[in-house]
Every structure is written in C-alpha cells, then in structure tokens.
Design a protein with these regions (language model features):
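Radical SAM enzyme [4Fe-4S]-AdoMet core and its adjacent flexible, acidic
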Residues: 1-142, 146, 150-160
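Flexible mid-to-C-terminal extensions adjoining Fe-S/redox cofactors in radical SAM and related proteins
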Residues: 125-127, 144-145, 150-238
C-alpha cells in the first residue's frame, strides 16, 4: 500500500512516483525484474508485495530479508537498520510462506549449492573465499575502485584518480584477495562453516558490522542456522 511504501521511503509522494515510473517502463515494452527488502515495516504486506511484483516482472521476483549496515557507519542510522531486521524465526517463517522461494532453496541445498560440508575441514586463512574481484568489480561516483560494492573497509579500495584501471585490476585486486584473517571468529567459525551460503557473512559485511573483516557476527550466524534447520533433514543440520 501507499502507506507502507512511504513509511519505508520516508518520502511523501514516493509511491505515486514509483508506480508512475514503473508503468511508463512497462507501457514502453521494457521488461523489468523486481526485488523487495523484507523489513519489519513491510513484513505484514509481503504477500501483497509478492503478488504486485510477480504480476509485473519479466521472469522472477525475490525478496531479501538480510540487511547489512551502512557504509559510513552512522550509529543512529545503523540502529534504525537493526530495528528493521526480522528475527531468524521470522525470516524462516516468511521464506516458508513463499512456496516458490522455499522450494528453490530446498533444491539448491539438495544439489549442494548452499551447504558445503567440505568447508568444515578448511585450513586456508584467506579472507576472500567469494567471487569478489574475480570476474567483476565496482567503481563509485568518485572513482573509487572496489572488488565488490559492499567492500568499503580501509585498505581494500583503490583510487582510480591516482592510478589506472589496469593497475587496479592486475595489481590491487590480487593484493586484496591475498589478505589473511587472524581473528578467532573467522578462523574457528566462519571459514569452516558449511552454511556460508545461507549466511550474510563475508569480509565486507563483517567489517560493516564489527569494524573488522575477520570477525564473527552473531545475527548472521543465528539466521543461517535457523534457515538450515528449516531446510535440511535433521541428520544434515550442523
């Protein structure tokens, strides 16, 4: 509804502007793909949001219940974000309620794409086990080069105004991807967790939550284990 949409955007008239813009795109024959964030402020309307989006999307719609904190570390805004986060149990409940999403997650678990038991024997201490900087990167409006759009931690970005794209890609990316973790949270938990793909944890998000790229994050961990308990047979749940 307009009320819920504008409670999230905090801008009067934004619902009308959004629907007008979307209608213009659709009327022009432009295919769109829609995504929504699942927040405490809109969780009561997720069914309606899903119906609205699926009627208009070119192929699929998804919602994301995992909120990371702000890149600038603003403490007031970060508390507002935390207040909008759903509990692990609420996240599982809304995923169960969306049959298409839940079945897709189950299928991916069965194929071994979301749960990786082999990681439990991981000995590598490289921080970046993800695809950041492997086939893509991000460049901000100010010329800041990042391995991914969420990676803002000091010492991981490159100023293209003071160097070249070739240097960033061929020299800086390998340097950042070679960084090692020394924190106990990373070494004893996250790097050896089979549920990493059910979790929001990564070096970039850990830095936003804790200030360190190799720290464990309780909320992410609780969500991952709650999702695993819902998706996996009892004998497969870590």
């Amino acid at each position: 509804t307009r009320e819920t949409y504008e409670a999230v955007t905090r801008r009067a008239g934004s619902w009308r502007a959004f629907t007008r813009g979307l209608d213009l795109l659709l009327d022009a024959g432009i295919k769109v793909r829609l995504k929504a964030m699942a927040l405490r402020s809109n969780a009561h309307e997720l069914d309606e949001i899903s119906s609205f989006c699926r009627e208009r999307t070119k192929d699929f719609y998804r919602f994301d219940p995992l909120l990371h904190l702000r890149f600038d570390g603003d403490p007031v805004r970060n508390e507002e974000i935390k207040a909008e986060r759903l509990s692990p149990e609420e996240i599982v409940a809304i995923e169960r309620a969306d049959r298409t999403r839940f079945e897709a997650l189950q299928n991916e678990c069965e194929k071994g794409e979301l749960v990786c038991p082999e990681l439990e024997h991981q000995s590598c201490d490289h921080l970046f086990q993800c695809g950041a900087g492997v086939e893509s990167f991000s460049v901000g409006y100010d010329g800041t080069f990042r391995l991914c759009s969420s990676l803002w931690h000091p010492g991981t970005t490159y100023d293209l105004r003071a160097g070249t794209l070739r240097e960033a890609w061929e020299e800086w990316v390998p340097h950042v991807r070679d960084l090692r973790g020394a924190g106990a949270g990373f070494l004893e938990r996250c790097r050896r967790c089979a549920l990493v793909n059910l979790c929001l944890w990564c070096p970039a998000h850990a830095a936003l939550e804790t200030g360190a790229m190799d720290e464990w994050t309780e909320y992410f961990c609780d969500v991952a284990h709650a999702r695993a308990a819902a998706l996996l047979p009892d004998d497969m749940t870590p």
